[in-house]
Amino acid sequence: FSPDLKDPITTFNIAPGIQPGFWAFAPKSRGMSNESFASTKANPLLRLPSPSIRVEQGDKIIVTLENSHYFPHSIHFHGVDHPFQKENGEGNDGVPQTSNKLTMPGKVVSYELTPRQTGTMVYHCHVQAHTHILMGLIGMFIVEENRPNNWVQTFNIGAGFVRHSSKAVKEAYSQEYDLQYQDLDKELHSLIQT
């Protein structure tokens, strides 16, 4: 955010004249979350909802959370079969009450998992989940069937269209889209802008 602006929260154009503030998980990139120092409009690389993560069944996945926000956060892979603790005893589930501590501002935590079951699940922040999920800290986590020479699109960061579908999807469908619906709480989303 820009400390020079009255309202230093990134806003998203969701309809003409409607620009609520959101939080979002995003792939690491260069630059600010805003278009410029003079604008609160979101950088084009920062999209809502948080990006879909697509992986193959049986692949070892490492997701790193670098918390650049002013609140603590975590990532919980909801419905994904994975160990609650790493081999070294550190928490690995993103649930602060049971498995690991909060990821405080400026800190980094990596989650390791090897999904065994295919399907469409979600990942979300599990710190004050009733608020952080509504604020945008939720995304789709899709585990594709593992097939030889399968190439899956790891991140889908905009418009929902999956540019590189898996072999299983291509056999049955001509196109694939990731659709995730998000509720908005007008008061909550405007509260962070004041």
Regions found by a protein language model. Name each.
Residues 11-12, 23, 27-31, 37-38, ...:
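Acidic-aromatic/histidine active-site loop/patch
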